[in-house]
């Protein structure tokens, strides 16, 4: 199986399976000399960790990260950083009834057809459990971007099923299990999820991610555009079925006189571009929106086939997220960080000494550049 590595200069290769002894990532290309400990990584892993509320899978994994290499006396050495997370709460017997059948909407069928073998225990390599090492690697990238450029990457849930979540303030996001930026809507979301779990069904979600203080100039036209690489990475997250940058599909209904972000000496007037023009960052906030499909492992009986091609009925039991989008916010943040650090290092290598007389204007009119 190929396709396990993301990035060009700052690369992340993940390994492991959902019910194997451990999962992890090897981060290569991290600049040397950055202070790094497990504590720098653990915070984001705890945000993604399962079993933290009744609205997510009840699989109890501590997700304690171990740094096995690439750090000496508390600082990165520039050599590969191996991050290990041990699996401790596998319950493989829950998957005994799908050894010979394929879950509708899951990768069971495609993995079997492609490889002729599949690990049915928790989905094996196709499990959302494999987003944990991505979050760990993303925490390393976040730290470097923050220290080098002051870049901050934050995300929130803007929709759960058919319920829109209006944005009120960032301060609400860490205060609830949904990463919702609105405290008033939490009771409605909880009632909705409780009913969904009773019904044995699942639902999708929409996640927004914003990177602020992004340097101007990241991205390589034509085929290594920053927004193209962001979309590529985000589509690598389990269950993501759509990605928008900036105004996204709303651009279709906008006129050019509205969509084009006007530049003034005081800054950009709008940010319909999502912080990327011509595949290159503008210095504005990079804004990304993700559509996440409903979880495929549900108790509701559904039609399928077995390995022999015979008709079968599939019911999935065990501990599953009724909405994988609830824990997707730190994953999306990590993916954005991994793309940004890779392009930052590439930009520094090729264009680090480029100087122009035109001043950098603020990301938004009225702000300081």
UniProtKB/Swiss-Prot annotation:
Pathway named in the protein's UniProt entry: Metabolic intermediate biosynthesis; chorismate biosynthesis; chorismate from D-erythrose 4-phosphate and phosphoenolpyruvate: step 7/7
Gene Ontology biological process: amino acid biosynthetic process; aromatic amino acid family biosynthetic process; chorismate biosynthetic process
Sites where the protein binds FMN: 125-127, 238-239, 278, 293-297, 319
Cellular component annotations (GO), alphabetically ordered: cytosol
Binding site for NADP(+): 48, 54
One GO molecular-function entry: chorismate synthase activity
Cofactor note: Reduced FMN (FMNH(2)).
Reported cofactor(s): FMNH2
Keywords: Amino-acid biosynthesis, Aromatic amino acid biosynthesis, FAD, Flavoprotein, FMN, Lyase, NADP
Matches recorded under Pfam families: Chorismate_synt
EC number from the UniProt entry: 4.2.3.5
Catalytic activity: 5-O-(1-carboxyvinyl)-3-phosphoshikimate = chorismate + phosphate
Family: Belongs to the chorismate synthase family.
Role description: This reaction introduces a second double bond into the aromatic ring system.
PANTHER family from the UniProt entry: CHORISMATE SYNTHASE
Assembly and interaction partners: Homotetramer.
Annotated protein name in UniProt: Chorismate synthase
Organism: Cupriavidus necator (strain ATCC 17699 / DSM 428 / KCTC 22496 / NCIMB 10442 / H16 / Stanier 337)
């Amino acid at each position: 199986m190929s396709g396990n590595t993301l990035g060009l200069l700052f690369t992340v290769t993940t390994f492991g399976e959902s019910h194997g002894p451990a999962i992890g990532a090897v981060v290569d290309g991290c600049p040397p000399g950055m202070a790094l400990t497990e504590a720098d990584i653990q915070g984001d892993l705890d945000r993604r960790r399962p079993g933290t509320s009744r609205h997510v899978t009840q699989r109890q994994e501590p997700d304690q990260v171990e740094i096995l290499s690439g750090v000496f006396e508390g600082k990165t050495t520039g050599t590969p950083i191996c991050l290990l997370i041990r699996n401790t709460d596998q319950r493989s017997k829950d998957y005994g009834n799908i050894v010979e059948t394929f879950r509708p909407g899951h990768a069971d069928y495609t993995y079997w057809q492609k490889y002729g073998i599949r690990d049915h225990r928790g989905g094996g390599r196709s499990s959302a459990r494999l987003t944990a090492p991505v979050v760990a690697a993303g925490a390393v990238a976040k730290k470097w971007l923050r220290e080098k450029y002051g870049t901050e990457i934050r995300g929130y849930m803007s929709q759960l099923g058919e319920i829109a979540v209006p944005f009120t303030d960032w301060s609400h996001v860490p205060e609830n299990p949904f990463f919702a930026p609105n405290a008033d809507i939490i009771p409605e979301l909880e009632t909705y999820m409780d009913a969904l779990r009773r019904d044995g069904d699942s639902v999708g979600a929409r996640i927004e991610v914003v990177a602020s203080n992004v340097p101007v100039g990241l991205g390589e036209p034509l085929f290594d555009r920053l927004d193209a690489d962001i979309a590529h990475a985000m589509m690598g997250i389990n269950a993501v079925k759509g990605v928008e940058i900036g105004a996204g599909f709303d651009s279709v209904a906008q006129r050019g006189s509205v969509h084009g972000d006007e530049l003034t000496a005081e800054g950009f007037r709008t940010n319909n571009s999502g912080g990327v023009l011509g595949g290159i960052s503008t210095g504005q906030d990079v804004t990304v929106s993700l559509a996440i499909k409903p979880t495929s492992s549900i108790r509701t009986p559904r039609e399928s086939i077995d390995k022999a091609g015979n008709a079968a009925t599939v019911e999935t039991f065990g501990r599953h997220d009724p909405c994988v989008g609830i824990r997707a916010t730190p994953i999306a943040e990590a993916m954005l960080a991994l793309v940004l650090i890779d392009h930052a290092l590439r930009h520094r290598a090729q264009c680090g000494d480029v100087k122009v007389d035109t001043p950098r204007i603020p990301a938004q009119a009225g702000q300081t550049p």
